[in-house]
Structure formats: structure tokens, C-alpha cells
Amino acid sequence: MEIKTFLEGALKEDLGHGDLFERVLEKDFKATAFVRAKQEGVFSGEKYALELLEMTGIECVKTINDKERFKPKDTLMEIRGDFSMLLKVERTLLNLLQHSSGIATLTNRFVEALNSHEVRLLDTRKTRPLLRIFEKYSVLNGGASNHRLGLDDALMLKDTHLKHVKDLKSFLTHARKNLPFTAKIEIECESFEEAKNAMNAGADIVMCDNLSVLETKEIVAYRDVHYPFVLLEASGNISLESINAYAKSGVDAISVGALIHQATFIDMHMKMA
């Protein structure tokens, strides 16, 4: 969904048929407002906020940038426009910044806990309906990378896909003939044997799903000897406390759905000058 279309929908959701305050406002005038943080975090949502302000004729006098850290009481944005329009935009603007910064902040905590420049931290497709692009943009601002944006990015085969596949190697041979040349094939595995079979069958990426660090290390050791060009991804209930151990197991990437679905809003407010 294009940013403008997304923002138009978000604004309309809040405005309904119009802000009732306009009926009681005797005369409109120019005013200045400040968006300030009430807790620390990593800023995200700048691109969406600036587009929203431009759409509504509000001037952004000053803003901090995506990926910047902030502390409680810091001024994140200074905006100026018609008093009535500032009030119309207030909640939508805050929702965008609070939600996006919440994801970026939690993602950054995982990046710091990962403590590795060799292992990539990835998000997942566990996103809120119609918010995927927005939420994955927020992950990038937190310092991680995006996994697939959708089903058309790569062929990922899970247990539900493979339930009725009798010969995995033959299936992958058939798949490659029907996929774009650049499309990767990733197979989700829940045991050493499944991972071994996936590599033997020709998978480009093997996901070690819900496996212990020890089990993951065994798969890494097998990969390193027999299929050094296969990429390994660890996934499944990986926490801030365990992510560093998984990083040290030798995998190439770690995907964490919690970056998005466990993130909470960063508290902010808007105050008039």
C-alpha cells in the first residue's frame, strides 16, 4: 500500500465525518505544537509523519531523524499550522510515531543483545494486516533487516507445504524449473534429520525452527562440512536472553517475530506552544 493511501485511510478513520471541535471554534489561527517523548527510545516514523504533515498543510519546523535515540522530555518534532488542523492530525501523528518508534526501540534492544556483525537479525511476516510495509520499515530503523515482504519474495516451505511431498529432492527440482532464476528456496526444519534432508535435496536456506542451541550447532557443523554455501537461519521463541547464544552457534541469520508483535508504543505527547 502506498504511503499516501495508507495515511489517508488512517486520518479518515479518526476524523469520520469531521472534527466536532471545528463547530465550536469561533476563529482559526496559526499555532505551533511540539511532539515530545515521555520515555527513551529509538525514533522511527519520520517518513510517514512528514508525508502526513504535507498532506494536511502543516509545516514541519524541526524534527529528529529516523534511527536517532531520544530521552524523556526530548522534543522530537516542532510543527506549525492552523490550530484546527493541528488538533485533527494530533492522534494520527502520535499513533504513527509511537507505534513505529516502539518497534524500532525493541528491535534495537535485540540488535544490542545479538552483539554480532556477522549474524543478521531478521523480522518475520507476523505483522498486523495492512501494516506490513510500515512495521517492516520500523524494523529497519531499529537496525535489523527484513525477511520476506510477502509470498512472492522467495519460496519458503513449512510443514504444511511438505505434508504431502513424498520426494523432497524431486519436488525442489520441479520447483526450480517454475520459479524465477533469482528466487531462493528456504525449508523450515524441526530436527537434525529434516535439516540434513533439506540440504541434501538442494535447499538454498535451511531454517532451524524451535531447536535448542546445541541442536542448531550440530546442524551448523554438518552444513560447514557438506554444504558450506547453504545459509542457516535460527527461528522460534528466541528471546533477548538467548539470542546471543544462537548467534554464537554459527548460523547466518536469526529471525524474531517479537520485533514487531511484542513491541509496545513509546509514550509521547503533543503540546501547544
Residue positions per predicted region:
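Structured functional modules or segments
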Residues: A234-S235, L240
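Short secondary-structure boundary segments
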Residues: N210, G236, A258
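Active-site loop ensemble at the mouth of alpha/beta enzyme cores that anchors a bound cofactor
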Residues: H269-A273
